Amino acid sequence: MELRSGNSMVVAPKSKGIIDPNTGKLIGSDDRFFHDINAELSDKGFLVTSADALITWARTGSLMWMSFGLACCAIEMMQCSMPHYDNERFGYAPRASPRQSDVMVVAGTLTNKMAPALRKVYDQMPEPRYVISMGSCANGGGYYHYSYSVVRGCDRIVPVDIYVPGCPPTAEALLYGILLLQKKIRRTGSIER
């Protein structure tokens, strides 16, 4: 299937024959990306490209999160899912199982008794997996920092990618943390720890 337009031959994709009234040429015929693809297709008959950009784009637009709500910060995390903020419009949807989740949001005071459960849930998540630490208690122990039963930050148990400060942080702060995580994934393709 080919279409001849002047001196150039268009191989793929098949043109719909829509002509731009301003220029008199086929729409898309002056697109540099379109010409590069057509040149490679007409030369070899197939296209060789990297799927990294596509995978990174899909990964940032479909982050599935799992709640690990331990204390009062979990209320703000729930508020983030309500219609006023609607975090699903950013491609950030909740999942109940760690095996279907990409992101774990640790919200609240992590105790020594709960730490092995946190690690077990983290280990059940598929790669690549990300962790958002939400609130002062999850970040560094918070108000209960000097208690004998409190872990002084969930980063001692699992690697943390984004820290959201506050006691409790607002839903806007969590949304900002989600957007920062997406930006980091877009910039690097993954997050180096």
Swiss-Prot record:
HAMAP family in UniProt: NDH1_NuoB
Comment on bound cofactor: Binds 1 [4Fe-4S] cluster.
Sequence similarity: Belongs to the complex I 20 kDa subunit family.
Chief localisation class: membrane
Keyword Lyase included in the entry's annotation: no
Gene3D superfamilies assigned: 3.40.50.12280
Subcellular location: Cell inner membrane
Residues that bind [4Fe-4S] cluster: 72-73, 137, 167
Protein name as it appears in the record: NADH-quinone oxidoreductase subunit B
The species this protein was found in: Bartonella quintana (strain Toulouse) (Rochalimaea quintana)
GO cellular component entries: plasma membrane; respiratory chain complex I
Protein EC: 7.1.1.-
Membrane-related topology note: Peripheral membrane protein
Pfam family, one: Oxidored_q6
Catalysed reactions listed for this entry: a quinone + NADH + 5 H(+)(in) = a quinol + NAD(+) + 4 H(+)(out)
Broad class of enzyme this protein falls into: translocase
Function: NDH-1 shuttles electrons from NADH, via FMN and iron-sulfur (Fe-S) centers, to quinones in the respiratory chain. The immediate electron acceptor for the enzyme in this species is believed to be ubiquinone. Couples the redox reaction to proton translocation (for every two electrons transferred, four hydrogen ions are translocated across the cytoplasmic membrane), and thus conserves the redox energy in a proton gradient.
Alphabetic keyword roster: 4Fe-4S, Cell inner membrane, Cell membrane, Iron, Iron-sulfur, Membrane, Metal-binding, NAD, Quinone, Translocase, Transport, Ubiquinone
Biological processes per GO annotation: aerobic respiration; electron transport coupled proton transport
GO MF term set: 4 iron, 4 sulfur cluster binding; iron ion binding; NADH dehydrogenase (ubiquinone) activity; NADH:ubiquinone reductase (non-electrogenic) activity; quinone binding
SUPFAM superfamilies xref list: HydA/Nqo6-like (SSF56770)
Cofactors: [4Fe-4S] cluster
Subunit structure, as described in the record: NDH-1 is composed of 14 different subunits. Subunits NuoB, C, D, E, F, and G constitute the peripheral sector of the complex.
Lineage: superkingdom: Bacteria
